[in-house]
């Protein structure tokens, strides 16, 4: 919607036609040489969008163009673009962006009342914000996604995300590729989880490797960042105090955009439909499936809900029943003679799990049980996150083969085989990082085999990844690699 609007805006003085398919926008323009050159020059100022994966310009000969009549009511947003940022930076001018929007945020300094940002109060609010931050005080900002408390970053990590005051500040703490830098600076200003540099991680003695970061999203925060960067402030810390909508978060993997969270940039009607439902995740799933005519296998793998393997809006094809305590777990493992012998050997060499488990019937919880066996953490959820972090940081070409399979002559998943193979590799002295990556990789092989069987029966033509478990990059990368014709939706993985 936003990119389509920009194309129409830049072509408004030309005869033009605009055509859209599901993934391609084609703009044809016609005019004299001067007008065409001016149009091409204007494209240089067009903001980069995370959703535009390719952009081509070519000359057409002897082709008539029927003028498009654009009747659409385009969505508007207070984007930071080269138009308003350059006017401020070079001339000190406060102007609207291409959508006729200035700044839609509201500020609060007293903890009680919010004041909308306007041209009249812009500089006064900017000076007050800088003054408060530099005296180690916080203030609040409100927009359509919620209320955030903002303060200087002081090495405290109980925050939701950081904002770099300038693009040059990023390298002081993070390792950022050119691709990620381009995404951060895009029109949408997404959140991206970046890896810390070794020096920064050592300075703060961090036990984690990544943190969420963004760049200023509108003119006010651009101006605020500019003033703070001049004072050698590199980052602001944001804590969300009231949630009205998820922040837009992405990552890129092998030239594919993965939208983790945030509904700000999907089809407006789809967003309204999803948000109107009590079960928003199921509404999101229904919308994803409605966009495809062919039969699809939806891989809905979650960190918070039961997993779903769904074909053509039918019943869940995955039956996964995990144990809720250690007693049940070890009883299931020892149900046959082989498992009993393995258990006796294992308990002589490793500490056994005990107590209750907080699990859902999903692969995230199963990976958490593997992580608990590896001693990554005593809590299933935390152990799962640490196992996924190990997997994502692994440099191994392949991991050990962990057993993921259904029970014999059944469509019920046999979780004991996964844990038994983990125990066997631990007894063999295999490192935790190898088992962690192997578990994620082996899960993908299980999904591939399940999918291939459906393809052979003509029940599925392609697969779609969905769900918060695909926040794990090694899982997503292997899934896209090993499952033929596997698609990524531009709808968020989870809500």
Residue ranges of model-derived segments:
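Acidic, glycine-enriched active-site microenvironments
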Residues: 1-495
């Amino acid at each position: 919607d936003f990119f389509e609007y920009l194309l129409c805006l830049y072509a408004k003085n030309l005869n033009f036609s605009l055509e859209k398919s599901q993934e391609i926008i084609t703009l044809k323009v016609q005019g004299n040489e001067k007008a065409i050159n001016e149009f091409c020059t204007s494209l240089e100022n067009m903001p980069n969008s995370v959703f535009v994966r390719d952009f081509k310009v070519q000359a057409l000969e002897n082709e008539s163009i029927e003028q498009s009549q654009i009747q659409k009511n385009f969505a508007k947003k207070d984007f930071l673009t080269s138009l308003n940022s350059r006017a401020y930076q070079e001339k000190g001018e406060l102007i609207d962006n291409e959508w006729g929007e200035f700044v839609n945020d509201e500020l609060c300094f007293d903890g009680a009342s919010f004041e909308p940002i306007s041209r009249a109060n812009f500089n006064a609010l900017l000076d007050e914000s800088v003054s408060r931050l530099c005296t180690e005080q916080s203030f609040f900002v409100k927009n359509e996604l919620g209320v955030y408390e903002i303060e200087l970053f002081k090495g405290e990590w109980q925050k939701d995300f950081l904002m770099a005051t300038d693009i040059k500040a990023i390298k002081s703490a993070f390792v950022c590729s050119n691709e990620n830098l381009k995404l951060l600076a895009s029109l949408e200003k997404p959140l991206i989880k970046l890896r810390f540099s070794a020096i920064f991680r050592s300075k703060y003695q961090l036990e984690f490797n990544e943190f969420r970061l963004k760049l200023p999203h509108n003119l006010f925060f651009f101006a605020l960042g500019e003033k703070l960067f001049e004072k050698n402030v590199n980052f602001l810390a944001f804590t969300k105090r009231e949630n009205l909508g998820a922040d837009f978060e992405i990552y890129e993997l092998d030239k594919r955009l993965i939208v983790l969270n945030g509904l700000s940039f999907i089809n407006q009607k789809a967003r309204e439909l999803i948000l109107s439902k009590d079960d928003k995740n199921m509404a999101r799933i229904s919308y994803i499936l409605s966009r495809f005519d062919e039969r699809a296998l939806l891989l809905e793998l979650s960190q918070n809900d039961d997993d779903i393997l769904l074909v053509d809006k039918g019943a869940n094809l995955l039956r996964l029943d995990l144990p809720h305590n250690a007693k049940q777990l070890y009883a299931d493992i020892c149900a046959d003679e082989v498992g009993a012998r393995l258990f006796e050997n294992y308990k002589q060499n490793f500490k056994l799990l005990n107590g209750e488990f907080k699990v859902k019937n999903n692969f995230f919880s199963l990976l958490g049980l593997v992580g608990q066996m590896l001693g990554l953490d005593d809590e299933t959820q935390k152990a799962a996150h640490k196992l996924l972090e190990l997997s994502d940081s692994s440099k191994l070409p392949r991991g050990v083969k962990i057993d993921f399979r259904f029970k014999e002559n059944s469509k019920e998943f046999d979780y004991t085989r996964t844990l038994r193979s983990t125990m066997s590799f631990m007894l063999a002295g295999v490192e935790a990082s190898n088992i962690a990556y192997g578990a994620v990789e082996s899960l993908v092989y299980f999904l591939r085999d399940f999918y291939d069987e459906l393809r052979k029966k003509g029940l599925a033509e392609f697969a779609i990844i969905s769900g918060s478990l695909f926040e794990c990059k090694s899982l997503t990368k292997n899934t896209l690699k090993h499952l033929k014709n596997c698609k990524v939706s531009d709808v968020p993985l989870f809500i």
